[in-house]
């Protein structure tokens, strides 16, 4: 179809949304004026400014644009919504570098405590949740937003549902990250690991996440392809389960609607159980199911091979969905949690090893007949190595959930090494590979600016990961053995400070590994930036000649 005429009038939806954000800005100004503490006043003022900026953007977009609602097709081609994907891709790299940098800082603080600088906002206690949230939710979350919006459009051959809704999701999510992150630095926290944001940030995330679910679901419902590709099943499981986890773990009663402090509804062992039901399944569905969707789409696309076994991918999906949700109690071994609950969590954790390795095998065997591409394509190599790290982490996790093993590993640096094998090796590498694929596609470039830089990124980051996790494995096992060592008289052989001193060289090695990983991400950011800036545009083929997505 031909391009529509220019429309400068606001739609009913745009008018309503602009009015809603104008009212929100007014209420936030009142909240800032009546705030009981400085952090709440800052966040209320920040929200007022952001709301007014949204109103301005809605009004501004009405000028010099095609018809009020974008056409579903232009000249016979699906008119895909790429703006939100570009925004999330950019924010993923921004938050990734920020999160890796903060991680390097806190790793250095453990090796050299003077780097805390005796300032509250530079202390380890405030920077650590900033690091985890920036890497997991800001970097990882934006990668998932960008890839899910791309994959669901391409595999369904239809534009994203809604006009402003996808933009609300990506902008609203990143504003939530900004509120949560600045809150940590100001001392605003629920003190629940991976669920630190206070009540008003949680409310914002709830609204954004429900909108995300609706956009994704409606896009699938109006698809033009009869089959729902398996990656969309994994994305949908991730979105739905994170919503349930967020609502279950974060009910809280604010001390005042004009203050940042709240009290969580649960207490005691119930709170601990809810927390690690949430914490473990945040790993299981945010850091596993969502990124498995990336694996199932991007590895076949990059390798130009079909998924090794589509049937195995369906078995992998349902087994993972059923088993993962029950495994949380293994985080609470040797605590006040009832013993039968600990054993149940351990049992499901061990069972989880089988579907996890089924998915790993499916991802690796997709390269059947294309293994030679690993020599020439560093992006594919990065994606495949991420699957190997996934297999390693999903073997180590069930092993560490066994009570006998956990009696040594619990509370030690071994757990830190395990987490980062998954976070850096699996999540990091599959995210990097996805962005290396996605940016040229979305910005319509023939390829990346430099494959040689991708190769440098791969080897530098791999060396960083090996240094990091090896140091933490050795440190953790040494730590556990020193804690449980007794003299012939039955006294502890080592004082606590002696165990801390023994960790010092390993903490230096960890910081070095983290520094290398950060350098790799900076190389990637430069490569992607140059791809967008100077990359050669790709000539689009007619729809009839395009390969199926």
Language-model-detected regions and their locations in the chain:
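Surface-exposed loop and adjacent secondary-structure segments within mature catalytic domains
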Residues: 196-197, 259-267
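Extended, leucine-rich alpha-helical cores of fungal transcription factors
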Residues: 227-228
């Amino acid at each position: 179809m031909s391009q529509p005429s220019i429309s400068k009038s606001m739609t009913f939806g745009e008018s309503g949304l602009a009015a809603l954000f104008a009212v929100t800005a007014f209420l936030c100004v009142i909240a800032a004026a009546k705030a009981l503490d400085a952090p709440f006043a800052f966040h209320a003022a920040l929200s007022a400014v952001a709301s007014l900026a949204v109103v301005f953007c809605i009004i501004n977009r009405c000028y010099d644009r095609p018809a009020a609602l974008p056409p579903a097709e232009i000249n016979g081609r699906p008119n895909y919504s790429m703006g939100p994907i570009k925004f999330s891709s950019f924010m993923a790299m921004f938050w990734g570098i920020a999160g890796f940098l903060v991680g390097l800082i806190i790793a250095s603080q453990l090796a050299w405590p003077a780097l805390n600088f005796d300032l509250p906002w530079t202390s380890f206690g405030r920077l650590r949740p900033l690091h985890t949230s920036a890497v997991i939710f800001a970097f990882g979350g934006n990668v998932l937003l960008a890839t899910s919006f791309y994959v669901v459009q391409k595999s369904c051959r239809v534009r994203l549902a809604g006009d402003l809704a996808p933009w609300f999701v990506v902008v609203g999510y990143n504003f939530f990250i900004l509120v949560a992150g600045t809150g940590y630095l100001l001392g605003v926290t629920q003190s629940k690991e991976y669920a630190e944001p206070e009540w008003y940030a949680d409310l914002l995330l709830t609204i954004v996440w429900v909108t995300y679910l609706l956009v994704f679901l409606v896009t699938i419902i109006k698809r033009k392809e009869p089959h729902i590709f398996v990656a969309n099943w994994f994305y949908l499981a991730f979105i739905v389960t994170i919503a349930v986890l967020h609502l279950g773990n974060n009910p809280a009663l604010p001390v005042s609607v004009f203050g940042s402090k709240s009290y969580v509804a649960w207490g005691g062992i119930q709170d601990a159980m809810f927390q690690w039901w949430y914490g473990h399944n945040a790993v299981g569905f945010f850091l596993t199911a969502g990124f498995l969707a990336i694996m199932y789409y991007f590895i076949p696309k990059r390798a130009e091979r079909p998924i090794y076994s589509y049937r195995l991918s369906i078995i992998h999906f349902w087994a993972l969905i059923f088993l993962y949700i029950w495994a949380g109690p293994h985080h609470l071994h040797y605590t006040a949690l009832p013993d039968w609950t600990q054993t149940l969590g351990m049992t499901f954790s061990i069972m989880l090893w089988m579907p996890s390795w089924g998915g790993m095998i499916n991802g690796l065997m997709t390269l059947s007949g294309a293994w030679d591409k690993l020599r020439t394509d560093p992006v594919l190599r990065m994606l495949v190595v991420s699957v190997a790290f996934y297999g390693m982490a999903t073997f180590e996790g069930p092993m560490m959930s066994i009570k006998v093993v956990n009696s040594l590993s619990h509370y030690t640096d071994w757990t830190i090494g395990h987490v980062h094998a998954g976070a850096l090796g699996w999540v990091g590498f599959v995210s990097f590979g996805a962005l290396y694929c996605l940016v040229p596609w979305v910005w319509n470039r023939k390829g990346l600016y430099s494959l040689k830089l991708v190769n440098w990124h791969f080897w530098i980051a791999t060396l960083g990961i090996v240094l990091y996790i090896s140091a933490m494995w050795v440190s953790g096992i040494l730590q556990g053995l020193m804690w449980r060592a007794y003299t012939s008289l039955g006294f502890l052989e080592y004082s606590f400070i002696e165990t801390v001193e023994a960790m010092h060289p390993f903490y230096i090695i960890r910081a070095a590994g983290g520094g290398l990983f950060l350098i790799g991400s900076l190389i990637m950011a430069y490569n992607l930036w140059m791809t967008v800036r100077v990359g050669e545009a790709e000539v689009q083929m007619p729809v009839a000649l395009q390969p199926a997505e």
